């Protein structure tokens, strides 16, 4: 129950649930965020009942030796508060034996000796008011399958398969791909492959000025596979605000470019057409995450999705959701949080808002990208 004890102003509060895991084996933090929720606007002297839950699988920790997530036997202290620095123990969850919840493979094993940093002993108080025994018989083990070498696909179909045939389930996508030439498959991987002076990283689209790029149109006529237009983010759509075409629709050089550069439009004919692509400036990820409001992130995503529809963008290269690991990382402002659960929930809400408009999002960047500039010489050792 959340109550506004003030006398003047209405406000909102964030209820956060943390879990202090048993410390009898695998190394674990003092407490981990496992659930949170933002209240409605509460006027003075009013209150709101809030219900939070989390999957039991979040009680697990990863064991590199066994390559699996394990809920170790012991006591788990459930905490509730409004920040990681302000929690109280409300319940004790008891696990009577080790439970394997997910089996994996170690695919990023470290290649060097690494001394583990151990904190000095921290006392973990136990909640004595409420105790719950976890029923291990109701927890299923998830087994991950990893892609092995694929067998060669042969195709004896003489008819040229189009993407419409695949959508209609007349043929499979594998059967269509098996008909492609090496050149067609290669061009699909490199996109438009621009080499002129208008090709700029982050703004290389043929079709929408300022967009990041396009996938290849090599299969558009032959197999009805339309090319996709990608726009960068994550603080809204990054497009060229103003561009000019001739009467035949050919885009003229000039206008605002990447990183605020500007080139004047030259030799503009009298019958030229001026186009404008002004997009909403959405607050950056770090600011959005501080709201702890997934509904707000969803609405921001809907704004992005609507503008993508308007400007014919198929895929937004965002949100950015790397974990804040180093305060000197040059792109921390783009990322949500140093907490993985918090960052994941924020990003998921954002993407759901975008997808509600039938548009796609592409979360980024590569895992453990914690250095910029320069971003081409960093070394990430993962456990």
Language-model-detected regions and their locations in the chain:
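Glycoside hydrolase catalytic-domain context in secreted enzymes
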Residues: 1-61, 68-86, 104-383
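Short beta-strand elements
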Residues: 86-105
């Amino acid at each position: 129950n959340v109550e506004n004890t003030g006398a003047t102003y209405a406000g909102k509060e964030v209820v956060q649930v943390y879990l202090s895991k048993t410390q009898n084996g695998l190394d674990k933090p003092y407490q981990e965020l496992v659930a949170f929720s933002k209240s409605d606007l509460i006027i003075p002297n009013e209150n709101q009942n809030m219900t939070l839950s989390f999957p039991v699988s979040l009680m697990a920790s990863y064991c590199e030796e066994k390559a699996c997530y394990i809920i170790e036997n012991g006591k788990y202290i459930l905490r509730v508060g409004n920040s990681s620095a302000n929690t109280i123990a409300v319940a004790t969850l008891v696990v009577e034996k080790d439970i394997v919840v997910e089996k994996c493979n170690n695919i990023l094993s470290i290649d060097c000796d690494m001394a583990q940093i151990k904190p000095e002993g921290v006392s973990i108080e136990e909640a004595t008011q409420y105790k719950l025994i976890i029923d291990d018989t109701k927890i299923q083990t998830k087994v991950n399958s990893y892609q092995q070498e694929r067998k060669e696909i042969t195709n004896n179909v003489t008819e040229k398969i189009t993407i419409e045939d695949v959508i209609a389930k007349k043929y499979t996508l594998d059967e269509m791909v098996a008909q492609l030439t090496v050149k067609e498959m290669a061009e699909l991987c490199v996109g438009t492959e621009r080499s002129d002076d208008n090709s700029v990283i982050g703004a290389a689209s043929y079709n929408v000025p300022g967009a990041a790029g396009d996938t290849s149109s090599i299969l558009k006529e032959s197999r009805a596979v339309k090319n996709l237009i990608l726009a960068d983010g994550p603080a809204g759509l990054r497009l060229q605000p103003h561009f000019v075409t001739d009467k035949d629709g050919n885009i003229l050089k000039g206008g605002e470019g990447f990183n605020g550069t500007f080139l004047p439009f030259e030799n503009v004919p009298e019958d030229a057409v001026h186009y404008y692509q002004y997009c909403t400036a959405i607050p950056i990820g770090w600011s959005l995450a501080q709201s702890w409001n997934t509904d707000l992130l969803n609405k921001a995503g809907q704004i992005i999705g609507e503008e993508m529809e308007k400007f014919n963008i198929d895929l937004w290269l965002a949100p950015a959701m790397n974990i804040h690991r180093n305060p000197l990382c040059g792109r921390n402002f783009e990322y949500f949080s140093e907490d993985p659960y918090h960052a994941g929930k924020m990003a998921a809400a954002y993407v759901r808002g975008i997808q509600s408009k039938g548009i796609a999002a592409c979360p980024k960047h590569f895992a453990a990208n914690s250095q910029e500039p320069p971003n081409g010489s960093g070394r990430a050792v993962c456990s």
